[in-house]
């Protein structure tokens, strides 16, 4: 329960204790020591995206083709770039409350290999060109440049690119936030929020909000922050005006594997001792809507292998077989074959919050005092340093530098244009199938791609969509009548 017994009214109630919710409470307290703050969320954080992540500080390895040529995608990339520069200082400050000093280990290897699709080569070409144009330090390396990248022959390396992305164990960061709350008078409620009530609007000031917890306690406040990812949707649905104006949140499910090396291998060497030399993230680019195969070392002989990704209308409580199958194959076939003898345990699923247009929901909604730190998809942990600082400024009456485009109450933002979105869907879908073992003879490649294009074009026609682009991970939501009816929202460009 709360650190202050009997308190019912707060200046700010933050619903959600993952990277964004906890990070925002941290920034609020840092910027105003007198503020009364409550953070609501189960301490186990089951289902939180951060708990199922490695985690990587993903910036350049996540850039997609055309990222900087599309205004909305460029602004989303800007969030990660700005956040990246804040992490070292953030870790230095937060280390006071950590079980051990926090620091980012910088450096990530992106691999192109024989198992990837042609789209992956183009994706890495784009990343390299984008870094060159912006004078971002990187290195294009030969296939044998990193001695511990030793895949099976079928996954032979074609090219390696070292980018400045980083890694840190996200669980350590969350643990430091928890200790900070206890030390700095932030009330943490180890419960779920089950009810949200909003009174009549008072212009500029907002009305009193009431947040009911699972145990029956009621918290009153002028400012509620919805930062519990897609779990927030059940609260949004209770406020019709909010539900009508804010794009629906979907469940971006993802799971990973905790990989460890048995003691006998540590003693005798196993298949290849080079696995003990892994000292940086190694990954492919995004594949089939997922964040590729990526291995995050923890510097103690343990690793995180991730990550699956699928956008669902309803959550599923356990990982899917095909998702874990692809990860295990990728670990051995594409990173180091010596992992054949490793031990694994599942982590997740965690649910990345995916808005109906896949763009983030940031800042104050059209209803005063209702705030969002949500919809960040796979970027929430990486972006949290910047997003939380800026939202805290605005809650406290200052100016935020977050893009106005991502205001929560809005029309759906187009993913590029219709034609470009369809092209990206076909490339991503085929890339996902290649990841699952698809091989087509040359004469069948174009007919296969044409069939996919025709299928997604029928979805556009069925929903009467003109030049608006559907994100490549969402056509199945538009295709299903039940899902579409629940998620339908006004679109820009139409």
Spell out what each predicted region is.
Residues 160-215, 219, 227:
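Helical element adjacent to the flavin cofactor pocket in flavoenzyme catalytic cores
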Residues 13-15, 218-231, 388:
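Short hydrophobic core segments
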Residues 98-115, 134, 140-184, 308-312, ...:
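Helix-loop-beta segment of a Rossmann-like dinucleotide-binding subdomain
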Residues 56-146:
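Dinucleotide-binding Rossmann-like beta1-alpha1 core, especially the glycine-rich loop
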Residues 394-494:
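Helix-rich C-terminal "cap"/substrate-channel and partner-interaction subdomain
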Residues 10-38:
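N-terminal Rossmann-like FAD-binding beta1-loop-alpha1 element of flavoenzymes
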Residues 23-30, 42-43, 51, 55-61, ...:
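Active-site substrate-recognition segment that forms the wall
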Residues 336-436:
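C-terminal catalytic lobe of FAD-dependent flavoproteins
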């Amino acid at each position: 329960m709360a650190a202050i017994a009997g308190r019912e009214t707060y200046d700010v109630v933050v619903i959600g204790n993952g990277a964004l919710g906890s990070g925002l409470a941290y920034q609020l307290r840092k910027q105003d020591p007198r503020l009364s703050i409550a953070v609501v969320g189960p301490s186990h954080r089951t289902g939180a995206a951060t708990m199922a992540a490695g985690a990587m500080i993903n910036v350049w390895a996540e850039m997609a083709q055309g990222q900087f040529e599309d205004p909305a995608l460029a602004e989303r990339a800007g969030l990660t770039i700005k956040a990246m520069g804040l992490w070292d200082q953030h870790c230095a400050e937060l280390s006071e409350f950590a079980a051990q000093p926090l620091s980012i280990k910088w450096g990530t290897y992106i691999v192109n290999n024989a198992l990837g699709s042609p789209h992956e080569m183009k994706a890495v070409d784009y990343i390299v060109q984008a870094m060159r144009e912006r004078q971002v330090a990187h290195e294009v390396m030969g296939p044998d440049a990193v001695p511990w990248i030793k895949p099976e022959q079928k996954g032979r390396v074609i090219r390696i690119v070292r980018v400045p992305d980083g890694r840190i164990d996200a669980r350590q960061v969350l643990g430091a936030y928890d200790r900070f709350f206890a030390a700095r008078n932030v009330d943490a409620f180890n419960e779920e929020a089950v009810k949200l009530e909003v009174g009549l609007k008072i212009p500029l000031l907002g009305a009193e909000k009431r947040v009911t917890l699972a145990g029956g306690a009621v918290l009153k406040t002028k400012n509620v922050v919805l930062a519990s990812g897609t779990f927030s949707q059940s609260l949004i649905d209770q406020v019709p005006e909010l539900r009508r104006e804010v794009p629906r949140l979907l469940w971006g499910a993802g799971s990973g594997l905790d990989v460890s090396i048995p003691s006998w291998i540590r003693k005798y060497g196993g298949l290849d001792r080079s696995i003990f030399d892994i000292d940086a993230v190694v990954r492919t680019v995004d594949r089939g809507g997922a964040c590729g195969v990526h291995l995050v070392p923890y510097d103690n002989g343990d690793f995180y292998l991730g990550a699956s990704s699928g956008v669902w209308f309803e959550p599923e409580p356990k990982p899917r077989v095909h998702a874990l199958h692809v990860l295990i194959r990728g670990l051995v076939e594409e990173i180091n074959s010596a992992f054949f003898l490793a031990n694994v345990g599942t982590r997740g699923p965690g649910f990345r919050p995916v808005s109906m247009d896949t763009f983030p929901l940031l800042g104050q909604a059209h209803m005063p005092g209702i705030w969002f730190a949500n919809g960040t998809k796979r970027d929430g942990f990486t972006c949290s340093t910047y997003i939380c600082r800026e939202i805290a400024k605005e809650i406290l009456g200052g100016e935020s530098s977050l893009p106005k485009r991502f205001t929560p109450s809005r029309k759906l933002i187009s993913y590029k244009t219709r034609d470009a979105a369809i092209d990206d869907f076909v490339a991503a879908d085929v890339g996902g199938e290649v990841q699952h073992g698809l091989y087509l003879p040359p004469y069948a490649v174009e007919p296969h791609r044409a069939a996919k294009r025709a299928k997604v074009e029928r979805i556009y026609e069925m929903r009467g969509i003109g030049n608006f682009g559907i994100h490549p991970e969402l056509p199945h939501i538009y295709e299903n009548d039940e899902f579409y009816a629940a998620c339908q929202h006004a679109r820009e460009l139409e």
